[in-house]
Amino acid sequence: MKRTLIIAIGVVALLIVGFTISGVAQETQSNKESRQAQHEARQQQRAQRLAEYREHLDSTILSHNYRFVPETMQQLPAGMMRNLQNPCYEIIVWSEAVDVCIPFLKGYTPPYYPVVFNYVLSSVQGYIVEQTDYGWHVTFQSTMFTATTFTFSFEIYSHYGAATQTISSPFYNSMQYTGNIFGI
């Protein structure tokens, strides 16, 4: 009798443990499915936000109303990279003018001397906007009230909002700036 009772208790205990493990396994499977659904929803939300950002940046560039804020500058070829901390440095492109306030190193051979281009250009020549695989390529030219023609070239990356801007001239080494594009 004792033996039967011990066997019965053992069987009941095994059944309880079995049901508990089965319930935990079902709950774990349910949690995995729930997490997978949440993960897919977050991926879709991020993809939608990225697409909306690209569309916003595309419309900003096409409107000809944007602001470039440089973070670094480098004289080409192979000049020293300099961080720009002054928040006043920017190039603002409007449909009717271009506002330039940006540092530049003049000179073809050392010693170079730093200047700040601080002009409002009421007219620019050859304003061209081209869509590329990675974003946009914008170029225009201006004399900036000198005898030298300066070419401004923007490479704008739609995926992450960054831009590389190059100012070139036949009489000076080119300067390259990296920064961000903002709508105005």
Task: Show where each model-derived region lies.
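Bacterial Sec-dependent N-terminal signal peptides
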Residues: M1-N31
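Amphipathic/hydrophobic helical signal segments and adjacent flexible N-terminal regions
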Residues: G23-D58
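Helix-rich interaction surfaces within compact, conserved domain-sized segments
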Residues: N31, V124-I184
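N-terminal post-signal-peptidase region of extra-cytosolic proteins
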Residues: E52-R54, E71-N86
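A short, Trp-centered hydrophobic/proline-enriched beta-strand micro-motif
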Residues: D58-Q74
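Structural motif
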Residues: N65, A97-D99, A162
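Generic short beta-strand segments
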Residues: V69-L76, V100-F104
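Mid-length scaffold segments of soluble, non-membrane domains
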Residues: R82-G135
